[in-house]
Amino acid sequence: MAIEGGERTCGVHELICIRKVSPEAVGFLSAVGVFIVLMLLLFLYINKKFCFENVGGFPDLGSGYNTRTNSQDKMYNSYMDRDEPGSSSESEDEALGKYHEALSRTHNSRWPLVDSRQKSYAWETRQKYSPLSAEYDGYSTEASMEDGNCIQRMRRTPPLDELQPPPYQDDSGSPHLSCTPSEIGDAKCEISHCSNSPRCSFNKCPSEGSTGHEAESYHNKGYEDDVPSDSTAVLSPEDMSAQGSSSQLPKPFDPEPEAKYGTLDVTFDYDSERQKLLVTVTAVTDIPTYNRTGGNSWQVHLVLLPIKKQRAKTSIQRGPCPVFTETFKFNHVESEMIGNYAVRFRLYGVHRMKKEKIVGEKIFYLTKLNLQGKMSLPVILEPSYNPSGCDSQVSLSEASCGDSTSSCQSLQHGSVPEILIGLLYNATTGRLSAEVIKGSHFKNLAANRPPNTYVKLTLLNSMGQEMSKCKTSTRRGQPNPVYKETFVFQVALFQLSDVTLILSVYNRRSMKRKEMIGWISLGLNSSGEEELRHWTAMKESKGQQVCRWHALLES
């Protein structure tokens, strides 16, 4: 039997063979295709991984400066190579002087008008710097003009601390700044005659006392090598005698330091007879950019510490330099106990349909207050997780937190990762509220940059079965993130002693699996005695929120 098909015929046994071979051929070709696709995906993954590993951090902000210096170094090396062999006995200063003469001739031939900043930089490369000189100030006051609606003000001084007495006025009416003997040689105290705000000129000192002023927040560490510091380099006495009088010292380029969290223009007026304190918030400058805050509306909150019963807040203003000019009154501020009072300033970014976000805060202790007359000064805000704003009289690990957004840090565990949790249980509604307030000392073990963290909450029953779970939003690039997110779980009163609440902190990574930073558990299977005491205090608080710091356990 044969089937006719065109010019040739096929037997039945040939068709049977073809039908048996076709599925195998199709399977083989399919396997080859899948293998090729997998190899292609693996190649793309490896290529993307190496691409991300080879990319550095931020671009070098001083690339133009480095290019300029490299070209000058090349010119210097070529100039030194052209010298005769007999000129090797010349001193280094003479060779360097010839190099600068040749460099100046080259610049004059190309650019007739040389910038004064480049001249001062070329002069400074020949000098030898020393840490401190008593004849020159480390800061220079210059008037700076921002945008059209910005306030013209003088160079901001470093924030006052307890070791620096407040400014006063003598009988003649001329303002002064009182300096203690320990400050002589470290700072020059003077007053600006064209402004009502005092200013102090500081020099960098290698002593231990100056480390507090030189310490910067982690946001500025990446720019220390590229941006010149806000201090004028001075010559040592040996170089001063060699170079001549101090009148020939040029002023180098001294840029305005960039404030990261805002600066408040505040006026304090204290009346000791009436025990009344008037605080006027004029304006806010040096506000972070829109990319960091995500908004353009601002509001300032004030609270009198440590009682926290007298509060005030400004109206909402828009723009990069909002102007408030609002005065607030705080009563019952005794002059005998004024050292125990402080005013906390907080700058909030107000977003439409969103929760307010803290931009920066500062606690101003009234020990620095002028008890007679008005005192105007800038208040430089700091990150809200800065432990320097803690009140020593308040212990969050022993008492419940009335203000869940308190900025105090628990320092009892050192650099161990910690988390601040607020618990509240309403027996009437059967709702368990857990507020994740903030974290501390979160580290990225895989890299040196700050981690991108979020907190996961899981509620388990007595059998270890999951009843509910939720998580916070991700805080990117913050070792001390502020969450302030509340989660509600439905738990009956008879079940409250049989449930376990687990909080896990994770570091979210783009190309890799998430990494657990630490965890704690509260309730039936508490991870420690501190967690068990927190859970017991919540049940006995009768509807009041209880906040405690907890050290995270390693995974």
From Swiss-Prot:
Keyword check for Transmembrane helix: yes
The record's disulfide annotation reads: none
Top-rank taxon of the source lineage equals: Eukaryota
Q: List cellular component terms (GO).
A: membrane
Query: Where does it localize?
Result: Membrane
What does the UniProt keyword field contain? Membrane, Repeat, Signal-anchor, Transmembrane, Transmembrane helix
Membrane topology recorded in Swiss-Prot or TrEMBL: Single-pass type III membrane protein
Residues annotated as region Disordered?
76-97, 157-179, 205-258
Domain C2: from-to ranges: 260-379, 415-550
The protein here is known as Synaptotagmin-14
Native source species: Mus musculus (Mouse)
Q: What is the lineage of its organism?
A: Eukaryota, Metazoa, Chordata, Craniata, Vertebrata
Q: Which gene encodes it?
A: Syt14
